[in-house]
């Protein structure tokens, strides 16, 4: 009888121990999955942003346009303040504008308020890849670096969306650091993949 009691007790301890191990293993797997998912989101978006920067640097606009959101397209903003009424550009329209050398209206110049009417290539050179952002001095994910004198409404315009920023600080002593410049990409998930929905240039304006 005593032997039977000891055997039952040992079996209970064994089962309980195994259950604790199984529960701990499940918790560990859940925690690891959450960490992996968080890292994967950041890494995948940063990889897409880098692909966009490389495409802009080498002027491969087919690749750049392939990153546009398939149905929403991309909104281009020449300054930190995003005009939510400004139309979005689909990839096919962006490429057609390059091929046909069309002049597009991209927004308005800060200060004068005059319409920014430019062909795609000159706009890219002035308001998108105006610096070597692929090798930017500072980079960030979901955080702002450059802060100018215009309202930055990115988070209000694109709540809960991820973005990257590439920033060069000012170098001309004459301007006391105000000649900084930055580029931001905003991404949105579509069919389990991330695509670009906004390209925002920012700088200090007079």
Model-derived features with residue positions:
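Positively charged n-region of N-terminal signal peptides that target proteins for export
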Residues: 1-4
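Surface-exposed acidic loop/strand-edge motifs in secreted or periplasmic proteins
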Residues: 65-145
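Short beta-strand edge/turn micro-motifs at domain boundaries
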Residues: 126, 131-206
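Long, low-complexity intrinsically disordered regions enriched in Ser/Thr, Asp/Glu, Pro/Gly
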Residues: 18-19, 206
């Amino acid at each position: 009888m005593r032997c039977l009691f000891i055997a039952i007790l040992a079996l209970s301890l064994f089962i309980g121990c195994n259950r604790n191990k199984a529960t701990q293993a499940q918790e560990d797997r859940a925690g690891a999955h959450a960490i992996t998912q968080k890292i994967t989101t950041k890494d995948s978006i940063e990889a897409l942003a880098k692909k966009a920067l490389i495409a802009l640097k080498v002027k491969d606009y087919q690749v750049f346009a392939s990153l546009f959101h398939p149905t929403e397209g991309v909104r281009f903003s020449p300054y930190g303040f995003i005009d939510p009424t400004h139309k979005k550009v689909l990839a096919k329209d962006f490429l057609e504008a390059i091929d046909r050398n069309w002049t597009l209206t991209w927004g308005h110049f800060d200060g004068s308020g005059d319409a920014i009417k430019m062909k795609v290539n000159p706009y890219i050179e002035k308001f998108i890849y105006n610096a070597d952002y692929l090798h930017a001095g500072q980079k960030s994910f979901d955080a702002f670096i450059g802060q100018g004198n215009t309202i930055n409404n990115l988070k209000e315009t694109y709540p809960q969306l991820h973005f990257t920023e590439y920033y060069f600080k000012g170098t001309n002593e004459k301007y006391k650091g105000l000649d900084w410049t930055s580029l931001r990409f905003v991404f949105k998930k579509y069919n389990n993949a991330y695509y670009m929905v906004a390209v925002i240039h920012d700088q200090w304006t007079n």
